[in-house]
Amino acid sequence: MDLNKLHELLGEEYVIMYKLHPLLKNHIISNHPNIICCNSENLYHLFSITDYFISDYSAIIFDFSIMNKPMIFYAFDLDKYKEETGIFLDYLNEMPGPVCYNEEEVANSILADEFDLSKIEVFCRKYHKYNDGHSLSRVLTLIKDIMSKDGA
């Protein structure tokens, strides 16, 4: 993605923070003061200050989805990626946010700010079914079951 172009489309009131894949961590994409490289930052710390999360096919979306914040999926090469790498889910129907193919579509999604957060809730129910506040209870039940089978 051309972050300079995206920033130009969004305007000066927007700050773009980016963190590249670890294999690309030494790359600097832009020297613009409102386009900030966060490659050395903890990704999970960035989640809390992020208004919109833009990703491609990264599994990090599963972690970010718990934040219940808008996500945009940049899939400029979706057909090629499906063919060469493969995707285990129905990308166009399951992504909990707009799928965009260029910087203009990404910018328009942000500027319109009309995200359906209920799609994220559906996504989380499917992929985070145990994130329900009852994990400790399940672990205790499992421990008790194991202990009772072992005669403890």
List where the protein language model places each region.
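Hydrophobic/aromatic beta-strand patches that form the interior of the parallel beta-sheet core
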Residues: M17, I36, Y52-I54, I72, ...
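Short, well-ordered alpha-helix to beta-strand connector turns
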Residues: E13-Y14, T50, N68
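Conserved catalytic-core segment of nucleotide-activated headgroup transferases in glycan assembly
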Residues: M1-I28, C100, S137
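C-terminal alpha-helical cap of glycosyltransferases
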Residues: D132-A152
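Catalytic binding pocket for nucleotide-activated donors in carbohydrate/polymer assembly enzymes
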Residues: I29-N31, A59-Y127
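Donor nucleotide-activated moiety binding/catalytic core segment of transferases
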Residues: L20-F62
